[in-house]
Design a protein with these regions (language model features):
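Short, compositionally biased P/S/T/A/G/V-rich stretches that sit at domain boundaries
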Residues: 1-19
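Aromatic/hydrophobic beta-strand junction motif of beta-rich domains
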Residues: 18-27
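Short beta-strand/loop motifs in extracellular/secreted proteins, especially
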Residues: 28-32
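Solvent-exposed serine/threonine-rich low-complexity stretches and specific carbohydrate-binding patches
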Residues: 40-56
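Edge beta-strands of extracellular beta-sandwich domains
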Residues: 47, 82-90
Length: 90
């Protein structure tokens, strides 16, 4: 499975949504799991992504991240070697 993960912004402020663009390179129609990990590599958030499109736009609402600490976070698709990262700031 080849999937590209692109973030609309690499620096996210509290109160902003996280917008993720997921592009399937191999046209797989399998559902995906998008996970977010903190700096200690603990998985802190997961969301399922449908398998019916080559390009998906996923919005993680700001309310879901209000309790997270400032710092760097990593996005991964389960089973893919590619990842992306962002920094959460005040």
């Amino acid at each position: 499975m080849t999937v590209e993960i692109t973030l609309e912004k690499s620096i996210i402020k509290y109160g902003e949504d996280i917008i993720v663009l997921i592009k399937r390179i191999d046209s797989s129609d399998e559902p995906l799991s998008l996970t977010i990990h903190d700096e200690s590599d603990d998985s802190i958030y997961a969301i399922g992504v449908s398998g019916d499109k080559n390009i998906d736009r996923v919005v993680i609402p700001s309310i879901d991240i209000e309790q997270w600490d400032c710092g760097k976070y990593f996005l991964r698709i389960f089973g893919s070697k590619y990842s992306s990262s962002f920094e959460l700031i005040n």
